[in-house]
Swiss-Prot record:
GO terms for biological process: memory; negative regulation of translation; negative regulation of translational initiation; regulation of long-term synaptic potentiation; regulation of translation; spermatogenesis; translation. GO terms for cellular component: cytoplasm. The keyword Transmembrane helix does not apply. It comes from Mus musculus. This is Polyadenylate-binding protein-interacting protein 2.
Length: 124
């Protein structure tokens, strides 16, 4: 006859699953939870390398901006789109001539009238 205290519905305890003081029985090393510190120097070195790399990239961007300002490659007044008022002012400043000054310009020209027409991207 079976002992009623050993019924099959109660959970059975296996020796491998026994946990004592928050550690499993298999952990013979009491310092196992601190083993991550073993590689702390390597981790710190890697983080320090990443910080140096970020600083280097930041310095490169700063130098590029200073170089751009030094050579005036970007001039907002020149490079940004103009407002409608500025365009209208420029349009009003245009002068329609009677064509006589254009004929004088053509007569004094040093350009070859028999030259081929320039087309961008086409090699001759």
């Amino acid at each position: 006859m079976k002992d009623p205290s050993r019924s099959s519905t109660s959970p059975s305890i296996i020796n491998d699953d026994v946990i004592i003081n928050g550690h499993s029985h298999e952990e013979d090393n009491p310092f196992a939870e601190y083993m991550w510190m073993e590689n702390e120097e390597e981790f710190n070195r890697q983080i320090e390398e990443e910080l140096w790399e970020e600083e280097f990239i930041e310095r490169c961007f700063q130098e590029m901006l200073e170089e751009e300002e030094e050579h005036e490659w970007f001039i907002p007044a020149r490079d940004l789109p103009q407002t409608m008022d500025q365009i209208q002012d420029q349009f009003n400043d245009l002068v329609i001539s009677d064509g006589s000054s254009l004929e004088d310009l053509v007569v004094k020209s040093n350009l070859n009238p028999n030259a081929k027409e320039f087309v961008p991207g086409v090699k001759y």
